[in-house]
Each structure stands twice: as C-alpha cells, then as structure tokens.
C-alpha cells in the first residue's frame, strides 16, 4: 500500500481540501468586513437634566387608608380580612353584635393579622384596630376607658 493511499484514507481528499480552503478564505474576508470600524458620525447628547428631589404626595396619600367598619354578623369577617390583605388599616366597632359573634370575629382577625405580619389592638369597648405590616400603632388609649365593660370574657 502506498503512502498516498494511506494519506487519502486517513486524511481529506483533494476536493475536500479545496472546499475547506475556500470556506476558510470566505471566513477571513467576512471577519475583516466585521472588524472594519464604521464611519464616525457626530452624535449629540441632550444636556442632563438636574435630578429632582421631589416626591409626589399623591403616591403616599393613596397607599395609606383607614377603613371604618361596623359588622353585624360573623360572615362579614372575610371582607374585613380582604381590607387587611389590601394593606389598609381597619377600625372595627363590634358593639352592635352579640358577644359570641364578636369574639369569633376578633379570633378570625387575629389570625389574619398574624398571617400578614400586622397588629391588632383594642382601642375601646368592643372596638379594635387591625393594621397590616406597613402601619405602626404607637401609644395606647385603652387606659382612658378603664375597666367598665360588663362582659364575662376575661381576654376582652
């Protein structure tokens, strides 16, 4: 077996070599075209505007709301929880409800407030304030009312 036969057996044929050489040359010319810098054009940039340190009050005004509610039945507790989920503080007056229904609502809202990371505080007889995590309650006013409630429920 001659060396040329071995060479053609293991290496490319002359036609393949020519095709490879042609594709190599074509790649080289394409790369040169890509590497040529484009013509320089004059670009004008607008002058930078000074940064304004003004914050819209409307944004802050819309994000903080307090909802006043006076539910009559336990079935309204889910609507109150929806207000809390919407990041709105809620003041609930439970004086027009039976005590057992009011206790159930406070229990439900306590769980809701815990789940969203908020707070619930008593602000008067059968009146509570529930707040989401974006609202802080500072101070206490329950001392002004004293212990004049006539309910038998110790935790209220």
From Swiss-Prot:
InterPro entries: Cell_div_SepF, Cell_div_SepF/SepF-rel, SepF-like_sf. Keywords: Cell cycle, Cell division, Cytoplasm, Septation. Its main location: cytoplasm. One of its GO terms (cellular component) is cytoplasm. Residues 23-36 have a biased composition (Basic and acidic residues). Signal peptide: none annotated. Transmembrane segments: none annotated. Pfam families: SepF. Residues 23-50 are annotated as: Disordered. It comes from the Bacteria. It is found in: Cytoplasm. GO terms for biological process: division septum assembly; FtsZ-dependent cytokinesis. Homodimer. Interacts with FtsZ. Belongs to the SepF family. Cell division protein that is part of the divisome complex and is recruited early to the Z-ring. Probably stimulates Z-ring formation, perhaps through the cross-linking of FtsZ protofilaments. Its function overlaps with FtsA. This is Cell division protein SepF. It comes from Bacillus thuringiensis (strain Al Hakam).
């Amino acid at each position: 077996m001659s060396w040329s036969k071995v060479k053609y057996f293991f290496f490319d044929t002359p036609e393949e070599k020519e095709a490879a050489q042609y594709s190599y040359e074509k790649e080289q010319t394409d790369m040169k075209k890509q590497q040529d810098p484009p013509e320089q054009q004059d670009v004008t940039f607008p002058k930078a505007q000074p940064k304004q340190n003004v914050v819209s009050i409307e944004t802050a005004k819309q994000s903080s709301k307090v909802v006043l509610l006076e539910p009559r039945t336990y079935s309204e507790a889910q609507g109150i929880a929806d207000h809390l989920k919407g990041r709105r503080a809620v003041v609930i007056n439970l004086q027009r409800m039976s005590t057992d229904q009011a206790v159930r609502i406070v229990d439900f809202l306590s769980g809701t407030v815990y789940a969203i990371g908020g707070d619930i505080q008593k602000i008067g007889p059968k009146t509570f304030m529930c707040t989401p995590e974006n609202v802080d309650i500072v101070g206490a006013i329950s001392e002004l009312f004293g212990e004049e409630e006539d309910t038998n429920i110790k935790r209220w």
